[in-house]
Amino acid sequence: MTVKKIALVAHDRMKKELIEWIKKHQNLLKHHELYATGSTGQAIEKTLNVTVTKMESGPLGGDLQLGAKIVNKEIDILIFFWDPLEAQPHDPDVRALLRIAVVWNLPVACNASTADYLLTSPLFDSDYHPETPDYEAYRNRII
């Protein structure tokens, strides 16, 4: 089994759903490196009795800290249970995190069923590395 670096994030009204999902998959998740934003990380530690690398709370920059880890290839999977029914004060940060995950072709799940698909994929236990997009032309563009 290849150890994955998994970022787990949930908006306040979605934390209970994420924790229930984590309980369902705790035997698998406890063998991986887990990262999370503030209070989500605390809840995960309490649930799994494992150490979670905690960022700041989302509104205090935790989403952006995870985004930086994605850019630096320090995260393999993002599981983000975001609340589709409530506006967030840090919505630009949420969009930035999701955008940067797509930019770097990172596997992302935004609900339990998609997260189930990720964890049960045959690629999950392999040494799979998503193809990194080639942004050289963008980096070298003349403005």
Swiss-Prot record:
The keyword rRNA-binding does not apply. Residues 1-143 form the MGS-like domain. The active site is at D63 (proton donor/acceptor). Keywords: Lyase. Its EC number is 4.2.3.3. It is an enzyme of class 4 (lyase). GO terms for biological process: methylglyoxal biosynthetic process. Substrate binds at H11, K15, T37, G38, S39, T40, S57, G58, H90. GO terms for cellular component: cytosol. It catalyses: dihydroxyacetone phosphate = methylglyoxal + phosphate. SUPFAM superfamilies: Methylglyoxal synthase-like (SSF52335). It comes from the Bacteria. One of its GO terms (molecular function) is methylglyoxal synthase activity. Belongs to the methylglyoxal synthase family. NCBIfam families: MGSA, PRK05234.1. Catalyzes the formation of methylglyoxal from dihydroxyacetone phosphate. This is Methylglyoxal synthase.
